[in-house]
Amino acid sequence: MNDIERKIKINGVKSGLLLGLIITALSIASYYFITSITKSPVLFVAGPIIFSVFIPIFCVVFFCFNARKSIGGYWTFKQATTGIFTMFLVAYLVQFIGKSIIFDKFVEPNGIQKTQTAAINAKADILKQRGNAQVAIDKDIADMKKDFAQQQNTSIGSTIQGIVISVLFIFLLALVFGSLFKK
């Protein structure tokens, strides 16, 4: 492995660690935002989008430009994809360990129930604001509770399947970002 390839991978790991910490912090902030802070149904929907889409994309763009600059301002499609994939994979691992394992299992073990309660309350508020009948609201809430109950049944196989799908998605995203940031 030549020096530039090595530098790209090391930079990908460093950027991935930072991106993973940022995404983990944003995920935790989003959780507290929707379960404790916001009472507005609009903010319940908009908050997670801002925390999980817009801010992370801004960070990814910053890290991609920074990585390209660190190797002289030029990298091929392969180099861009390799560096970005490494960054995304490390960020995913940090976020998975930090949020999905440590935070969800030890800090907020009842987080899923709190999030579901907040989602049900936001949905009920939206339906009430639209003037829906109480019978329709109760039916929608019952459907949501049924969907949540089905999501509770996770197995090791479904967890592994989710990880594999995430890694494939990360690779596709790295290809897209690699094509955008090659120069």
Walk through the language-model features, giving the residues of each.
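Functional transmembrane-helix hotspots
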Residues: 96-130
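Individual transmembrane alpha-helix segments
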Residues: 142-168
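Hydrophobic secretory-pathway targeting helix
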Residues: 68-69, 77-78, 82-100
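Transmembrane alpha-helical insertion/packing segments
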Residues: 1-70
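Juxtamembrane interface at the cytosolic side of transmembrane helices
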Residues: 69, 172-183
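Alpha-helical transmembrane segments of multi-pass membrane proteins
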Residues: 10-18, 82-91, 161
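Alpha-helical transmembrane segments of multipass membrane proteins
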Residues: 22-30, 55-56, 91-95, 99, ...
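Low-complexity, acidic polar-rich segments
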Residues: 128-150
